[in-house]
Structure formats: C-alpha cells, structure tokens
Amino acid sequence: MSNKQHRVPDFYCSYLLRSIPKPNSFYIGSSPDPVRRLRQHNGAVRRGGAYRTKRNGTRPWKMVCFIYGFTSKIAALQFEHAWQHSYKTRFIENNERLVTKKNTRNGIATKLGNARLLMKHPYFDKMNLHIRFFDRLAWESWELNKFKVDYGLSLCEVDEAVLTDESQLDELDELNLERIKAFYEDQMAQESSLLQRYQDNLTYDQKSCMICDKKIDYIHDEGTQMVGFCSDDECDFLSCLSCLYKEFTKNSKQIIPKSGHCPNCHKCLEWSQIVKYSTVLREKLIKD
C-alpha cells in the first residue's frame, strides 16, 4: 500500500465547449490545462481531442466557461461525468432534475442549471468551486438563472473583455483561446508566487504554531506536520493545519469546513485553498 501524501492539484477544471458554426452543439470535458485541451479539440494539436469535437462542421469550438477549484483529479472527473449525465447522476436529486432522459437535447440554460445543481451538492459545495465565463451569452444565461437554482453567484467570475466583445465570427476561436490562456497563466503565476512566499516563510527560520505554540521546523524535520497559512500579504499567520482545522470547526457542525477567519487578521479564508497549499508545500519541501 502506498504511503504517498495526497496533493491537491495546482489546477483542474471541468469545462463547457460550444461549437461556433453550430451553436446548438455542446461538449463537456475536464482538464488540468484548458489551453492545451482547447487546442486539441480544435485540431491545433494533432494528438488528443474527443471524437465528438472532431465531427464535420462543428469546429472551431470555444470554451464558454469552466468550473475550477477541485481538491483532486478524481473530484473533477466525477463532476465532469455528473455534468455529462445529469439525467441520472446521484449528485442531483430526482425532484430537482432538469433532464430526465439520455437523449434529450438541451441548451445553454439547462447546461448551466445542471452546473448550479452540482455545485450546490454537499460533496462539491465544500470545495468552494468557482465558475469562470469567457462568453457573454453564457454569462447572461447564468445571471438569468432560468431554473431558479439558488447557488454560486458569489463564486461566479466573468472575463470583463467579453462583455464589450464585438469580434467578428472568424476571430472568436482565437480570441477565446487568448483569454483562456491569459487567465490560466495569471492563475498559475499567482499560485507560484503565493507558494514561494509560504516556502520562504518556513525555510528562513524555525517557526512556531500561532495557536498551540508547537515548533514547526521544515529545515531539519522531514516528517513535520502540515502547515496552514493566511493568504493576506500583510499577515504572517501560520499554524499546524490540525490546529487551524479545530479553530474553523469549533463552532460548526460541519466535519469539513468551507471557510473560516484567520485568527490573526480575521480575513475569510477558504479551507480547500489552505489544504491545497499545505499539501503542495509539504511535498515540495520534502523533495528539496
């Protein structure tokens, strides 16, 4: 049996494609690299891409939105499968289903309604998933919320450039790829910068948990406990991950918290992000 520590992926998303020449054609997938995956679907990369996106007359595709923040690859694949099979997935209650038959054709409003239903399920809800839009019509459909599914508005993001987009039809796929690339690269740069700050904090000197006062020494102790940080640039809070977990759940009935406030600066922090950086940092420092 492997003793390998679970690591939250740097990035993994479940995405919705829409055919530009055939706007009633959609495709749902998942990937750790949406830029490369979109290029595969559009034939710019020879290997990869799904059979359904290769059908005559459907290319090029644009990625109208993706959902990200999954705490594991398995969770992202489960979301993808549930989104593709919304008519039967266990993650949507029977009395809430928008689609009840396999071959029912449904438009953007139904696709996004199903995304809302999945995001509100307790299993995915605890991950604090975000949905990012790269298409104005898709974003407007989300905002309209045709099926009145009450979830996700606070975690909705939209690429502001698409709100004033007047691009020609033959430019849409290239601009869509550029916007997704810009967001993905910015996201990865932010992740790298934050991780480097945490790493510097741990390796420059011996630290102590600011809750239990236990010494935290990543310099000499390879088996040291995982650590939780505050993401605020002006806050130097750190603690044992287990101590922060107890702090976040002491007045809650939730086994896994969604969020909590930094004991030092009181900023609201997403638990899934704290765990993510804790696992990545531990793996990186042990390897180094």
UniProtKB/Swiss-Prot annotation:
Subcellular location: Nucleus
EC category: hydrolase
Kinase keyword on record: no
Keyword terms, alphabetized: DNA damage, DNA recombination, DNA repair, Endonuclease, Hydrolase, Metal-binding, Nuclease, Nucleus, Zinc, Zinc-finger
Coiled coil (UniProt feature): none
Entry GO terms, CC: Slx1-Slx4 complex
Annotated CDD domains: GIY-YIG_SLX1
Job of this protein: Catalytic subunit of the SLX1-SLX4 structure-specific endonuclease that resolves DNA secondary structures generated during DNA repair and recombination. Has endonuclease activity towards branched DNA substrates, introducing single-strand cuts in duplex DNA close to junctions with ss-DNA.
Record family assignment: Belongs to the SLX1 family.
Organism: Kluyveromyces lactis (strain ATCC 8585 / CBS 2359 / DSM 70799 / NBRC 1267 / NRRL Y-1140 / WM37)
Name listed for the protein in its UniProt record: Structure-specific endonuclease subunit SLX1
Record domain GIY-YIG: where: 10-93
Cofactor(s) essential for the protein: a divalent metal cation
